Amino acid sequence: MKPLSARQQQVLQATVHHYVDTMEPVGSRTLVQRFGIPASSATVRSAMGALEKRGLLTQPHTSAGRIPSALGYRCYVDDLLPEPGVAVQHLERELTGLSLRWAALDDLLQQLARRLTDFTGLMSLITRPQQPRAQLEAIRLVQSGDRLLVMLVEDSGRASHLNLRLPPGASDELTAIERWTDQQLEDGSINWRSLPPQLQRSGDVLRSALDHPSMSPETPLVVHGLSRLVAEPEFHSTAELRPLLELIDDQPCAVVSATDQPGVWIGEEHPQKALQACSVVQAPYRCGQEGVGQVALVGPMRMAYATAHAAVQRVARHLDLLLN
């Protein structure tokens, strides 16, 4: 694409700022008056026409002014993003007051997500660092009446347990199913396809225990500010909102991209169709050698990108410092 002239850059930046603030299309006269562009309305109108021809601005109604297109937002983010305001310094001061106790990492992530949402007005997500999966070392089953205590022991030393009701007839199989799982784990993992038919009832109980959420080592991510996202005018349509809520409810980790670089996904750039009416701003953070987590903000394409970009970068950097 041919580079924009200085005047076109100024007009595009002003149009984005106006629309983010007001959600109203804007005309040339308003841009001149509000943003002090040193040119006549006719000159600014000509620049807006050129930007529209290049697909950077669009006119929602024949008699209306212009608003940014997804391509216009992309050009703005890549080339015209201003320095964040002094308000970001206030966020940094808040972050310095948050410290990490290893027993309360989830609490820390919740606090950071809440501060991100309060600061930006956007929905925030923070994923935990993707850590290597622990190897299951042993399964122990303890019966007490019609209850069964299932205990899992990992090679890391971590243990978890679940107390559940034992179905009729399954108690006779417990010794055999425990012996079978020991043999399976000696080979590295459990191959359920090799489960003997006579152990099917106890096997079903054990599989349901292994799949129970309480047996997961940790929450994979925290989400805050969903109500802020739902309240945005862009999502008042049920057709836009339903697939977005379903994605966040069923596959929240799919909202962020697995990357070790900061990024901004605008509209149809996002691989998830449910998010193609949104923008996602994210930055990675690291936890030693254990993996990469993501700090992300989700909102309409009409968002304050400079503030969002600066906020996720600072929270990610704060987590880097705390975890390393």
Swiss-Prot record:
Q: Which GO terms describe its molecular function?
A: DNA binding
Is this entry keyworded Nucleus? no
Transcription regulation in keyword set: yes
Superkingdom, according to UniProt? Bacteria
Q: Which GO terms describe its biological process?
A: negative regulation of DNA-templated transcription
Q: Which InterPro entries match?
A: GAF-like_dom_sf (IPR029016), HrcA (IPR002571), HrcA_C (IPR021153), WH-like_DNA-bd_sf (IPR036388), WH_DNA-bd_sf (IPR036390), WHTH_transcript_rep_HrcA_IDD (IPR023120)
Pfam families per record: HrcA (PF01628)
The UniProt keyword set, sorted, is: Repressor, Stress response, Transcription, Transcription regulation
Family label: Belongs to the HrcA family.
Q: Which NCBIfam families match?
A: hrcA
Q: What does this protein do?
A: Negative regulator of class I heat shock genes (grpE-dnaK-dnaJ and groELS operons). Prevents heat-shock induction of these operons.
Question: How is this protein named in the record?
Answer: Heat-inducible transcription repressor HrcA
Task: Please tell me the species this chain comes from.
Answer: Parasynechococcus marenigrum (strain WH8102)
